[in-house]
């Protein structure tokens, strides 16, 4: 593991107070449970590989990886909505948010899920919603590539409202993923992946791709501006560590930030570099979304699938899709022992021994 110490100047920029906006937007709702169901649902893909005996307490290698949804352009951002017993997941390029229930299968929850249609020509490669979490208010908080904002969605009325869409007057690039602290602060990443031409986009206003922390009182801190492609993120259960992936071919890394009592980073450590897996082994995917269980085990997507890291950093195992199939993100759901994974054109689930 490689350690690099950051100064306060490198860790933090000046904070800015951001009021919670009152804007709302509506979206077309389709309640039919027909879309995205085909004969692949119920089949299995991939495999589970054990690197350490410690994996046995978390996951059985014989557990099937079951397909629950298919025919998706690019699945992302799964979130389990406990108050309703359903899964939501994004399809960013299709501008759709879908819903899955054990009984009814898959239906369209929001369309458009991000930018209002028609989409401006030449501006967006991913106009829809991306990462999602259930907030302390019971709303679905969304890292929305299309509106270039952190949004929230009422799970009953499906009304959308803007939480924050700028830092110091400059529009976000295309928020990608988010994670809540116990206090209700939300950490989120802002790479350029939603924009056509990425960093060269004509509508990009920031000259960096940031990681931010929004406090419950509306204070917004830029906590990292030095990553080329910040993407997935997760907090350790004791909230002393923030994991952040960098989804860049040149530096495919997962970083661990040590946090102070205010939830702000003081240093960062390299958990793992995936150049070998990506370049030498040719495994599909890059460091992307992640989640964490109640014991602090990290489930992180990277070249080859979902890697499972113990709190001490040891890599315990790997959940893989079919060859050439990247896995982009994951969440725990149902009774806490099901890991839902967005897997390219599919969404799959894996039963776990651990609770998330």
Curated annotation (Swiss-Prot):
Class of the enzyme per the UniProt entry, highest EC level: hydrolase
Residues spanning the signal sequence: 1-35
Compartments, record wording: Periplasm
Name of the featured protein: Gluconolactonase
Catalytic activity: D-glucono-1,5-lactone + H2O = D-gluconate + H(+)
Function statement: Hydrolyzes the gluconolactone formed by glucose-fructose oxidoreductase, and that formed in aerobic conditions by the glucose dehydrogenase present.
A biological process from GO: D-gluconate biosynthetic process
InterPro entries for this protein: 6-blade_b-propeller_TolB-like, SGL, SMP-30, SMP-30/CGR1_Lactonase, TAT_signal
Keyword terms: Hydrolase, Periplasm, Serine esterase, Signal
Free-text description of this protein's post-translational modifications in UniProt: Predicted to be exported by the Tat system. The position of the signal peptide cleavage has been experimentally proven.
Gene3D superfamilies according to UniProt: TolB, C-terminal domain (2.120.10.30)
UniProt-listed Enzyme Commission number(s): 3.1.1.17
Entry's Gene Ontology cellular component terms: periplasmic space
Superkingdom field: Bacteria
Subunit structure: Homodimer.
Taxonomic lineage of the native organism: Bacteria, Pseudomonadati, Pseudomonadota, Alphaproteobacteria, Sphingomonadales
One Pfam family matching this protein: SGL
Gene Ontology terms, MF aspect: gluconolactonase activity
Chief location: periplasm
Record pathway: Carbohydrate acid metabolism; D-gluconate biosynthesis; D-gluconate from D-glucono-1,5-lactone: step 1/1
